[in-house]
A protein has these predicted regions:
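Cytosolic-side transmembrane-helix boundaries in multi-pass membrane proteins
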Residues: 119, 175-182, 186-189, 259-293
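Transmembrane helix-bundle core of multi-pass membrane transporters
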Residues: 84-85, 92-163, 190, 255, ...
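Helix-loop-helix "hairpin" substructures at the membrane interface of multi-pass membrane proteins
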Residues: 136-215, 239-245
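Short loop segments and helix-boundary regions at transmembrane helix junctions
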Residues: 29-33, 62, 72-118, 163-165, ...
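Inter-helical junctions in multi-pass inner-membrane proteins, predominant
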Residues: 1-9, 161-167, 194-231, 255-265
Length: 293
């Protein structure tokens, strides 16, 4: 097994894990998977590519603008496609699935018509590069190291956030929504905040992924599927689960691609997902709770 393939799998797994974290951020206070997260990842990458390549803007300023724009788009999605459904007094069922998928199709179709299907090459931020250096028998680039570092920073930031008052309120809603509301916690306000933060983070994931996977309309569906797989493998709502699930997925994908034809990579990852869910339906780090009524 080539060590370089393992490194590439780990780095791809970090991108999948970060995508899964954006799904979990919104899921915890709302019990809703925003399937438009993949489109937000793609839009972040496309805005960034347009600003850097077309507008000749600096990498860091373009990243800031792209993240802000995607956060605002995520706010609009919350106001139009999620909040009106989950606030229904009769219950929302799974209506959010249809609404967020509809938003996904609208956004992807709009971006595809505006910029076309051709992928755009995005440079990594200076002084990072995609040039490989031989380290312990593996080819590693400075940008790959940067992605791993960003994932570690995201874990630390989320751990810190959930230890604060607002984060603790989100965890309380995730644990027992009714009891949290009796304590004066507003699920709607926290859902709005989580949607903005999750959307902005999705835009940043798109920026991180673009130098490796190129900025294109197809980037969104690919990372949405992989991010959802990471969450399902690791356990819904679990930060640790999304991270470990994403890394397992990326490494397994790389190993499968090196041993078999690359065309079987998706089949290999879905087989892994199916196997884990057959053994542990709640995921590796998910929990099952029985509620007395």
């Amino acid at each position: 097994m080539d060590p370089s393939s393992l490194v590439q799998g780990l780095v791809a797994g970090c991108i999948y894990a970060l995508t899964g974290l954006t799904l979990n951020i919104i899921y915890r206070p709302t019990n809703v998977f925003n399937f438009a997260q993949g489109a937000l990842v793609m839009i972040g990458a496309m805005i960034f590519a347009w600003l850097v390549a077309g507008g000749r803007m600096s990498w860091y300023l373009a990243a800031l603008i792209a993240v802000g724009c995607v956060g605002l788009i995520s706010l609009a999605i919350w106001l139009v496609a999620i909040s009106p459904i989950i606030r229904r007094p009769t219950g929302h069922g799974a209506g959010w699935i249809i609404s967020t998928l509809a938003v996904t199709m609208i956004l992807e179709d709009a971006v595809g018509k505006l910029v076309g299907p051709d992928p755009r090459i995005v440079p990594p931020p200076p002084p990072m590069s995609m040039n490989f250096h031989r380290i312990l028998g593996a080819d590693v680039s400075s940008y790959q190291v940067t992605i791993v570092v960003f994932m570690l920073l995201a874990i630390i930031a989320m751990g810190w956030f959930y230890a604060q008052r607002t984060g603790a309120a989100i965890l309380a809603i995730a644990e027992d929504r009714d009891a949290a509301m009796l304590r004066g916690i507003d699920p709607g306000r926290l859902g709005l905040l989580s949607c903005i933060v999750g959307g902005a983070m999705a835009g940043f994931v798109g920026i991180l992924a673009a130098p490796m996977m190129y900025a294109s309309v197809s980037l969104g569906p690919t990372l949405l599927i992989r991010g959802f797989e990471a969450v399902a493998i690791g356990g819904t709502g679990s930060v640790r689960g999304a991270v470990i699930g994403g890394c397992i997925l990326g490494i397994f994908e790389a190993v499968g691609g090196s041993l078999m034809s690359p065309g079987y990579q998706s089949a290999v990852t879905f087989a892994l997902l199916l196997l884990i869910l057959l053994v542990r339906p709640q995921g590796l780090f998910g929990t099952t709770r029985a509620r007395v009524i």
